[in-house]
A protein has these predicted regions:
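Sec-dependent N-terminal signal peptides
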Residues: 4-16
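Short S/T/G/P-rich N-terminal loop/turn motif that feeds into the first structured element of a domain
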Residues: 19-220
């Protein structure tokens, strides 16, 4: 399996028009890479671990701003269900000593994620907020409203809200994804200039108790 081989198929699943949370789940393995470029290149050339766990789609996100430590990044895998994601976590233990990987990265932790709003899986330039929410359903609804308003304003920004499962101290994730940094910056500029969709963003924060952190990532 090549990274992102089944991207279109999984995107179709996550975009099904249903009232409950969309299907699918993700896992992330957070690491400290000794050399980010070398680690990513190694994974692209050695896809056996991804094939072994049976993920539908796989990729990486590299933290570019707001880092908690040098070389901060994670490897993500997408599945058709939480069940599949949980089963996959039993097939591969990243904590097991591996001489090849030990030279390239240090494992921090792993998490399973459930998307709680429709989300088009098209990685790119991504702003990530780690949030403590008091009503995740209401917050997700606000993000649906905001995404529609952004599209009406001519912006191609995909918003994802993700519920952590077995994540230790992890909290909810909000991702705002664009194809380029320029597109993301334009949305932010318009917000501070008083764009009407900014009111939806501001209103959504009644459901946020705390912004734990905010980072910028480049994903593929």
């Amino acid at each position: 399996m090549k990274l992102n081989k089944y991207l279109f198929l999984l995107s179709a699943v996550l975009l099904l028009p249903i009232n409950s949370a969309p299907e699918g789940a993700f896992t992330t393995l957070h690491v400290k890479a000794m050399d980010v470029a070398k680690y990513v290149d190694f994974m692209k050339k050695n896809t056996q671990p991804f094939e072994a766990i049976g993920s539908d789609v796989a990729g990486v996100c590299v933290t570019r701003s707001g880092n908690q430590y040098p070389g901060e990044m994670f490897v993500w895998n997408a599945y058709g269900s939480i069940e599949d994601a949980f089963i996959a976590s039993q097939k591969y233990d990243p904590m097991t000593p591996n001489k090849q990987f030990e030279k390239l990265r240090k494992v921090k932790y792993g998490v399973t994620w459930k998307p709680v709003k429709e989300f088009e899986l098209r990685p790119g330039y991504e702003r990530l907020w780690r949030l403590k929410l008091n009503d995740w359903r209401a917050f997700a609804k606000k993000m649906e409203e905001l995404e529609s308003a952004l599209k009406a304003a001519g912006h191609d920004m995909r918003l994802g809200v993700f519920y952590p499962l077995g994540g230790g101290t992890e909290v909810f994730h909000l991702r705002a994804v664009t194809d380029t940094a320029s597109q993301s910056g334009k949305v932010a500029d318009e917000y501070f200039a008083g764009a009407s969709y900014g009111k939806i963003w501001d209103s959504a924060f009644q459901y946020v108790d705390e912004i734990v952190s905010e980072t910028v990532e480049e994903c593929e």
